[in-house]
Amino acid sequence: MATTMTKGRRAKGQAVSPARWAMYAGAVFVVAWIATQLFYFAQIAVWNYVNPQSTAFMRSDAWRLSQDRPDQSLQHVWVPYEQISRNLKRAIIASEDANFVNNNGYETDAILQAWERNKARGKIVAGGSTITQQLARNLFLSREKSYIRKGQELIITWMLETLMDKERIFEIYLNSVEWGNGVYGAEAAARYYFRTSAAKLTAGQSARLAVMLPRPKYFDEHRSSGYLTQRARVIARRMGAAELPE
């Protein structure tokens, strides 16, 4: 009996094997990952009917401004889709995602081209992102460039395309995309750069705003950039062919 009790105590005192710990850790990771995806899915479903109050990018910028520029606050005003100039809508589609209305949120050729450029450079320098992919990143993710983040971006893109129509995706994009240092959304950008409303933006103004999107903070500080002016002319010529979601 004494021998049996000794064996029992030894068994209780034995450490859990590394393989079992790995299994436990893997199970916790899978559960956490699934819970995160369900949260994203539910949040997107709600945003079909309720406008997002903020995005991951906005919250990050608001915190940065509170630390670096406490006298400056985030500029953001939501306006309905119908109150945003068709000029701006056409300019953004012409500049960022010419096939927005007809694609499923992905442009395979652009993704493959970005992959080749990244492989050649040995780091992520391009993402081949559509408007829906950009929105996925803005809403939930960070500015970090990694393959893990890109994978999550693609999953959220699928959720957006599954749960929302193109007009709603574009409406949220127009109201949440970054346009400068602490400037978010079409209405805030129109007021900040041109002292007008998003509804009254001209073709020229819209083309400039569209060109700023890939590097909004840079162009906020370099508004007289020759590239900005030249590229805006190109986008202005392409705007007429841009197809809008209706």
From Swiss-Prot:
Classification via Pfam families: Transgly
Enzyme class: transferase
Subcellular location as annotated: Cell inner membrane
Main location as per UniProt: membrane
UniProt keyword list: Cell inner membrane, Cell membrane, Cell shape, Cell wall biogenesis/degradation, Glycosyltransferase, Membrane, Peptidoglycan synthesis, Transferase, Transmembrane, Transmembrane helix
Pathway this chain belongs to: Cell wall biogenesis; peptidoglycan biosynthesis
EC number: 2.4.99.28
Gene3D superfamilies linked: Biosynthetic peptidoglycan transglycosylase-like
GO cellular component: peptidoglycan-based cell wall; plasma membrane
Gene Ontology molecular-function annotations: pentosyltransferase activity; peptidoglycan glycosyltransferase activity
Catalytic activity of the protein: [GlcNAc-(1->4)-Mur2Ac(oyl-L-Ala-gamma-D-Glu-L-Lys-D-Ala-D-Ala)](n)-di-trans,octa-cis-undecaprenyl diphosphate + beta-D-GlcNAc-(1->4)-Mur2Ac(oyl-L-Ala-gamma-D-Glu-L-Lys-D-Ala-D-Ala)-di-trans,octa-cis-undecaprenyl diphosphate = [GlcNAc-(1->4)-Mur2Ac(oyl-L-Ala-gamma-D-Glu-L-Lys-D-Ala-D-Ala)](n+1)-di-trans,octa-cis-undecaprenyl diphosphate + di-trans,octa-cis-undecaprenyl diphosphate + H(+)
Keyword Glycosyltransferase belongs to the record: yes
GO biological process: cell wall organization; peptidoglycan biosynthetic process; regulation of cell shape
InterPro entries: Glyco_trans_51 (IPR001264), Lysozyme-like_dom_sf (IPR023346), PBP_transglycosylase (IPR036950), Pep_trsgly (IPR011812)
Transmembrane segments: 27-47
Superkingdom of the source species: Bacteria
Protein's membrane topology: Single-pass membrane protein
Role description: Peptidoglycan polymerase that catalyzes glycan chain elongation from lipid-linked precursors.
Family: Belongs to the glycosyltransferase 51 family.
Protein name: Biosynthetic peptidoglycan transglycosylase
Species this chain originates from: Paraburkholderia phymatum (strain DSM 17167 / CIP 108236 / LMG 21445 / STM815) (Burkholderia phymatum)
Source organism phylogeny: Bacteria, Pseudomonadati, Pseudomonadota, Betaproteobacteria, Burkholderiales
Name of the gene: mtgA
